[in-house]
């Protein structure tokens, strides 16, 4: 999909296509649509990120709370979004043995208890061995620092999802704006 197509989308189509760039947060896509036209991937991405950055802390935490636990209940029940299912699968989290899954569930619960939102990590940039180590490491972080780190992971996930949608056109096709 190229940027000309993106810029020509009506509101409903744009939200349908980009509504899960930030996990379960179609409101962000709805707000970003109003910023058209976009000159390219980076411009579109910057509008998503600016929306996140402009939110008060409660809104930013809300975005984090929309993410599923890695290898958690949603995975076990088959209720992950298609994007999260694919990302967790690529990281090897859909095929953990029982001991690894239980360990990750325990760490996820400790993290959620400490910070008030689930552990967020760009799973596609990780693997099944790294996830629990990173979760244990981040459990030691201060809340303010961890909020920034988790939001950074949301942005990594969003970048990957936007790149997936825009494909080969994402880096090469730029639209000249009036």
UniProtKB/Swiss-Prot annotation:
InterPro entries for the chain: OHCU_decarboxylase, OHCU_decarboxylase-1, OHCU_decarboxylase_sf
Active site: 67
Top enzyme class: lyase
UniProt xrefs under Pfam families: OHCU_decarbox (PF09349)
Catalytically driven reaction(s): 5-hydroxy-2-oxo-4-ureido-2,5-dihydro-1H-imidazole-5-carboxylate + H(+) = (S)-allantoin + CO2
GO molecular function, one term: 2-oxo-4-hydroxy-4-carboxy-5-ureidoimidazoline decarboxylase activity
Keyword Lyase: yes
Pathway info: Purine metabolism; urate degradation; (S)-allantoin from urate: step 3/3
Compartment annotation: Peroxisome
Binding site for substrate: 68, 84-88, 119-123
GO CC annotation: peroxisome
Transmembrane segments: none
Keywords: Decarboxylase, Lyase, Peroxisome, Purine metabolism
EC number: 4.1.1.97
Superkingdom as given in the UniProt entry: Eukaryota
Keyword Lyase carried by entry: yes
GO biological process, one term: AMP catabolic process
Chain's role: Catalyzes the stereoselective decarboxylation of 2-oxo-4-hydroxy-4-carboxy-5-ureidoimidazoline (OHCU) to (S)-allantoin.
UniProt cross-references to PANTHER family, sorted A to Z: 2-OXO-4-HYDROXY-4-CARBOXY-5-UREIDOIMIDAZOLINE DECARBOXYLASE-RELATED
Family indicated by similarity: Belongs to the OHCU decarboxylase family.
Name under which the protein is recorded: 2-oxo-4-hydroxy-4-carboxy-5-ureidoimidazoline decarboxylase
Organism field: Mus musculus
